[in-house]
Amino acid sequence: MGFKGYILSIVFNGKDFANKYYLMLKEFLKQHNLRDKIALKVVLANDEPASNLYVSIKSRVAKEIGLNVEVIKFSANSVQSDILEVIDRENKNLSTDGIIVQLPLLKGMDLNSILNSIVYSKDVDGLSFVNLGKMILGDKKGFIPCTALAVLKILRDEGIKTLGKTVVVVGRSPLVGRPISILLSSKPYDATVIACHSKSIYLDVYLRQADIVISAVGKPRLIDKSMLCGKPYVIDIGISEIETDNGKILSGDTDFDNIKECVKFITPVKGGIGPVTVLMLMFNTIKAHLINNRMFDVLNRLEKLLEV
């Protein structure tokens, strides 16, 4: 359960949060006669179990709300030109609204070349240079990376104010950390952002100043309660596997059990930011269809429904 005003939910439930909006999107598509008319293509060029799981979740959600989704899977002996050829085909395919590439890629492939081969109007992950540039300039017709958009959505719906607050973002990747830092320091969020990373020597000093901590470095249990002060809000995006006496378990960047009593709000590793990221991918895909078909009045209604 979220909160309004002073009522806080200590541990965020991303599944319930996202499910509420999935139902809204399903009804939205039905109302506007858009069910089964919007197509998402997912390029999968690795054989990692985690990637296959993530793709299956995205596909299931897309189908449940009424989108068409196709997973284009490449074998381990595929080369970069194979992927570029398929992306070029889907760029030209008028029935394709969104194209995403599930990361990581096969070894030897150039990430930027592949991401930037997706035409920006179908880049619903928002990871191309064009869309990252649009984000920096505040162009609302661009696509914001889904995880960064998920962070904004959580902050807004959970009533976590950013105006004038100190936000420490741990992580500087162009996929997650950097977009979050740029967005939160911009209007209308107007936060004072301290951008750190895994090699920041005085990380604990910066963290103690934070009203809000957002971490996305993939270093398990990097942040513990000794590094926090004043019960901040914590959004933990990192995910890693660690060995324990009972086998491998998932861990975030924070030592969850260690800090959960020392914060106002925290996202867990399982059922935290992940479902909301998938939600924002659905939002971006529907948005792409509406922009490409110049359905701007319907787009306005969509943006009011999923306001960030």
From Swiss-Prot:
Signal peptide region: none
InterPro entries: Aminoacid_DH-like_N_sf, NAD(P)-bd_dom_sf, THF_DH/CycHdrlase, THF_DH/CycHdrlase_cat_dom, THF_DH/CycHdrlase_NAD-bd_dom
Any one GO BP annotation for this protein: purine nucleotide biosynthetic process
Pfam families in UniProt: THF_DHG_CYH (PF00763), THF_DHG_CYH_C (PF02882)
Reactions listed under catalytic activity: (6R)-5,10-methylene-5,6,7,8-tetrahydrofolate + NADP(+) = (6R)-5,10-methenyltetrahydrofolate + NADPH; (6R)-5,10-methenyltetrahydrofolate + H2O = (6R)-10-formyltetrahydrofolate + H(+)
Pathway terms, separated by semicolons: One-carbon metabolism; tetrahydrofolate interconversion
Binding site for NADP(+): 171-173, 198, 239
EC number from the UniProt entry: 1.5.1.5, 3.5.4.9
Keyword terms: Amino-acid biosynthesis, Histidine biosynthesis, Hydrolase, Methionine biosynthesis, Multifunctional enzyme, NADP, One-carbon metabolism, Oxidoreductase, Purine biosynthesis
Any one GO molecular-function label of the UniProt entry: methylenetetrahydrofolate dehydrogenase (NADP+) activity
Gene Ontology CC terms: cytosol
Coiled-coil residue spans: none
SUPFAM superfamilies, sorted: Aminoacid dehydrogenase-like, N-terminal domain, NAD(P)-binding Rossmann-fold domains
Keyword ATP-binding: no
Family (UniProt): Belongs to the tetrahydrofolate dehydrogenase/cyclohydrolase family.
Binding partners and assembly: Homodimer.
Function: Catalyzes the oxidation of 5,10-methylenetetrahydrofolate to 5,10-methenyltetrahydrofolate and then the hydrolysis of 5,10-methenyltetrahydrofolate to 10-formyltetrahydrofolate.
Name of protein: Bifunctional protein FolD
Native source species: Borreliella burgdorferi (strain ZS7) (Borrelia burgdorferi)
Organism classification: Bacteria, Pseudomonadati, Spirochaetota, Spirochaetia, Spirochaetales
